[in-house]
Amino acid sequence: YVGPPGPKSIQIRIVRPNKSDFNPPHRDIYYDNLRNALNCFMPIFGVNEKSSLPILKGSHLWKENKTIRTHKYPIIDGNKFSVPAVTSKKDGSFLKLIRPKVKYGQVMLFSPYAIHGGGVNLGNEVRISFEFRFWKK
C-alpha cells in the first residue's frame, strides 16, 4: 500500500534552480518508519540530466559503518537540513552520485538503503516530482 504506517502520503517536491530546496545525500533508513519501504520518484516537470534526483549506484549494499554521516539537522554550506547527511565513505573517497534519466511517465524505484539526494537543480526550470513509498502489507 502507499503511505507510511499511519497516514498515507504522496509528496510533491519542488526544487528551484540553484536553490537549497533539496536534501543532502542520505539514506531513508535513518528514519525507522522508512526502513522497510520501497521509494518511488516520479518526474512531473523540469526533470533532466541537470535536475534529476541523484542516487549512488550500488550504495544500498554498503554497510553503514563504511560511510561517514552527520547528526540530524546538519548545516551544510549554510543550509540547515532535517536528515543526517552522508558526507563520504570511511576511506575518505567522495560520493559519486549519478542522475538517472527518468522520463515522464516512468517511475524510479529504489531501496531506502540507497544513498540519494544532494541534488542542486542545475537546470533552468523548476523541478517538480511526486515522491511516495510502498510498504509490504
Where are these regions (language model features)?
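Conserved double-stranded beta-helix
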Residues: Y1-L56
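Residues immediately flanking
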Residues: R27, I44, S111-P112, F132
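Residue-level detector of short, conserved catalytic/binding motifs and their immediate flanks
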Residues: L38, Q106, I128
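A short hydrophobic beta-strand segment most commonly corresponding to one strand
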Residues: M42, N124-K137
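Double-stranded beta-helix
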Residues: K50-I115
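Short Gly/Pro-enriched loop/turn and capping motifs at secondary-structure junctions
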Residues: A114-G117, W135-K137
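Short proline/glycine-enriched turn/loop segments at secondary-structure junctions
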Residues: G119-G123
